[in-house]
Amino acid sequence: MYRLAVRDQCKCALQRTLQQTTANNRQFGGSSSGSGGREQGRRQQEEQGQQGDQGYQGYQSLPPHMREAGFGKVVLFVSPLAAVGGVITYAKYDDDFRKLVEKNVPGAGSVIKVALQEEPPFKGITKNVNDQIDKVKSGIETVTSTVDSVTSKVTGLFGGGSGDDKSKKSKVEPVKATPAEEKRPSKPSEVSKTEAKPVSKPAAAAAPAPAAKPKDNPLPRDVVELEKAIELSAQLAVKEYNVAIGVLKGFNDDVRKVVDKAVENGENSLWTTLKNRASARDTAVATAERAAREAQEKIVACEIALSAAATAQNAKKVEAVRDKIKKLVDHIGNVKDELYRHKDTASVSDKYWRNVEKARNYFIDEIESIFPGLSLADKKLNLSKEDLDLFILHAYTHVLAYQKELQRLQTDGELRLKRAIDSVRGDNDSEALRAQLEYHLEAERRKLAVENQKKIFHIHAESDKLLRLQLKKQAEAHADHIKDIVAQRETDLTRSFKRELEDKLATEKANYKLQLAGMLGKLRGMDAALAERADAERTANQAQALWAACQALWASVRAATPGVHYKDRLRPLKNEINAIAKVAKGDDLVAAVLESVPKEAQERGVYPEDALRERFLNVERVARRLALVPEEGAGLPIYFLSYLQSLFILRPDNPISKDELENKPFDYSKLDTYDILNRARYHVDRSDFLQALKYMNLLQGASRKIAGEWMKEARLMLETQQAANTLMAHAAASGLLYL
């Protein structure tokens, strides 16, 4: 980046130097024209300056013509010289930068050689002043054409055309060459020639003759062919780069999916698929880079051919070709940069799945070394109890080791991050190198630790096998040895034992009986304690099971199946009741409560609260419409009047008075059908079906007949719910005894 910045500064400095050279030529021409033609020369310079400004108005990067001023003129002269001096000084110590300047700036090689005293500065110039003037006259044309060529070159490199301001895209279309006349300023050779004439002929300054416009010569055939070949090669390179970018994007997207699928399903074929995709990715990248190299080689060849064929007559065409080549190079560079960004991401993905595969293979090898013949591809692993214990111990050891390693790596990573931040800030220049060395050393330590752990497990497995074999042999040898000793000692002790047997037999029998009696008492006590404990455990488990069964019964009565109509929500409670009876077998209270459950609830089931609430809405609507109809029925006018009355009577916001809510004495005989229904609706909305049933019992006439079925179902639900609550309370009380 530093070299690129210096290169841009050098180009700008050379550009200003060329402009300064043109200004000096104009001033030299004006001063040599004599006092008689000074005013005419000054008017001529102003006209030529206007023409030059019109020709250079598209050339934004060149500074304006120098004006006679004070300090600004000095700065304008000193700045280009300082920039050129800096470029020459830097080129002295950097050969690559010197080659770059000599390649991109024509004539820079000679200037650098002269400045560095590598060759004589005025080689071939005689001491004769007249000869020097003649050579200056003859060299004006050459200098003018050289300035024209250099100015065109610098304009192509640094000038801002309309195409330079556009945003660059990664996927590039074939570029069409822009006519050189739209980008290049007017040739300064005409201005130089016009201003240079007063040097040789002062008398002709008053009436200068117009300069002859050079004729454009066509480019050589090989240059044209190279230009076409470069366009085709650039299109092919961009196409291959885009194909490679697509392959890299697909590879990055597929890596994580394939790795997750391979880890979950355990398919070995997926790893082969990843390897094939990685190979296809590398092939696509190599093809793109090969196409880019071919295009670069052709561009270099074309640059060489253009440099050889460049003249003052075909400068426009040469500059147009160079502009086209520069655009192609820029487009190829943009696509290449995007390729390398995706390539970096692909390298991370490649490391990711290869590390996963490496860890998987390491785990398989380790398990196979510990358990020979075990296949991890099987869905069910047939492991003995000892192998299972060893496997659990192995996994537990690995988990502990990985946790410690993770904590240590996290701590080290924080320290390294701090060091890296400090090194970026410039606190310590050696911190970055030290952190990198520590990182590599730590990686080697981890690698050695993994290898040592693997060796330790292998040694541990082999040692266990050898230890078991040796213990088995030692046990057999020890058993044989003990058998021989016992046989020998048996013969020796038989005689003494027989003698002492009769003497101690009575004493031993007495002691044995005493010990046996004591042990028998202890065993009986332990048996009683265990039986009591088992009884307590059984009772506690029975209480828990009873509570669970009662909870199931209560849930069946309380809640309903969501999304099912209330007519289809009926479900017999026989299974729950049988489960409670089976769990609480022998409990008189549970048996009495179960006997009190209605038979209809056992065989048919009961409507839950949601269903009764939904049915109550229908019952309330019909009962309000039939409020005036008696129980035995009436005529059609009565029905119609009752319906009209239900339409005009609205529901109050507070259907129950404060006295009723506080259970104060109240005359219920004053309530009509609508008041009763409003109060029942109030309690149904609050899930107080018992109070709602009490109010519904106050209904009379057709309304009571309509609500009779609902009252029956509500009563059945309340009875069943009361039984379930009683059983749950009994189960909870029984369970509290054994907490």
Curated annotation (Swiss-Prot):
GO biological process: cristae formation; mitochondrion organization
Keyword Transmembrane helix part of the UniProt annotation: yes
Coiled coil start-end: 283-339
Keywords on record: Coiled coil, Membrane, Mitochondrion, Mitochondrion inner membrane, Transmembrane, Transmembrane helix
Topology within the bilayer: Single-pass membrane protein
Region of interest called Disordered, as start-end residue ranges on this chain: 23-63, 154-219
Residues spanning the membrane: 69-89
Chief place of localization: mitochondrion
KW Transmembrane (keyword) present: yes
Stored Pfam families: Mitofilin
UniProt biased composition (Basic and acidic residues): 163-198
Top-level taxon of origin: Eukaryota
Subcellular localization: Mitochondrion inner membrane
Cellular component terms (Gene Ontology): cytoplasm; MICOS complex; mitochondrial inner membrane; mitochondrion
Feature: compositional bias, Low complexity: 47-61, 199-212
Matches recorded under InterPro entries: MIC60
MF (Gene Ontology): ATP-dependent protein binding; protein kinase binding
Cited function: Component of the MICOS complex, a large protein complex of the mitochondrial inner membrane that plays crucial roles in the maintenance of crista junctions, inner membrane architecture, and formation of contact sites to the outer membrane.
Family to which this protein belongs: Belongs to the MICOS complex subunit Mic60 family.
Subunit: Component of the mitochondrial contact site and cristae organizing system (MICOS) complex. Interacts with the mitochondria-shaping protein Opa1.
PANTHER family cross-referenced by the UniProt entry: MICOS COMPLEX SUBUNIT MIC60 (PTHR15415:SF7), MITOFILIN (PTHR15415)
Protein name (record): MICOS complex subunit Mic60
